[in-house]
Regions:
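Short amphipathic alpha-helix that is part of the acyltransferase structural core
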Residues: 1-28, 126-127
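A short helix-loop-beta-strand connector motif used in the catalytic cores of GNAT acetyltransferases and
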Residues: 35-46, 99-100
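Conserved beta-strand in the GNAT
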Residues: 46, 52-61, 65-68, 73
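Conserved acetyl-CoA-binding loop-helix of GNAT-fold acetyltransferases
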Residues: 74, 80-93
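Short glycine/proline-centered loop/turn elements that form peptide/ligand docking sites
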Residues: 88, 109-111, 130-134
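Conserved GNAT acetyl-CoA-binding A-motif
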Residues: 94-106
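Conserved active-site alpha-helix within GNAT-family acetyltransferase domains
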Residues: 107-128
């Protein structure tokens, strides 16, 4: 049975395998950055199968005006079982009073269908566009 738990402290060694399993090399090639990111997150929820971490959602932001879903990961063999939805629902419930919850994701049919099913809309719905700046030296 899968349980969802909000964690105050998340250790790198407990979740690095998730990032490796989905090929997020920006994190796996820079584990020190991920470790710092984990410790500075607004909230992290883990999906557990017994004692095994099989998924997580990581939020950043102030928790009131803006919350950003930075990471939502479920191990591939656990996907399509409602775990990602359960993680998202838990996070959205805890931050239901926030002005806005945002995320950036790959532009695929799979991700669009999933996030729309969770109530998210693309920014153009609000006559907005998203932008990002990345430090290309790192």
């Amino acid at each position: 049975m899968i349980t969802i738990k909000k964690q105050e402290i998340v250790k790198l060694e407990d979740v690095l395998h998730l990032y490796q399993a989905v090929g997020w090399t920006n994190y796996t090639n820079q584990p020190q950055m991920l470790e710092r990111a984990l410790s500075h997150s607004l909230a992290i929820y883990l999906a557990l199968d017994g004692d095994t971490v099989v998924g997580l959602i990581r939020l950043v932001g102030d928790g009131f005006s803006s919350v950003l879903v930075q990471d939502l990961i479920v191990l591939p063999i656990y996907q399509r079982q409602g775990i990602g939805s359960a993680l998202m629902k838990e996070a959205l419930e805890d931050y239901k009073d926030a002005y806005q919850v945002q995320l950036v994701t790959e532009q695929t049919e799979k991700t669009l269908v999933f996030y729309r099913s969770m109530g998210f809309e693309i920014l153009s719905t609000y006559n907005c566009i998203g932008m990002t700046w990345m430090n290309r030296e790192k």
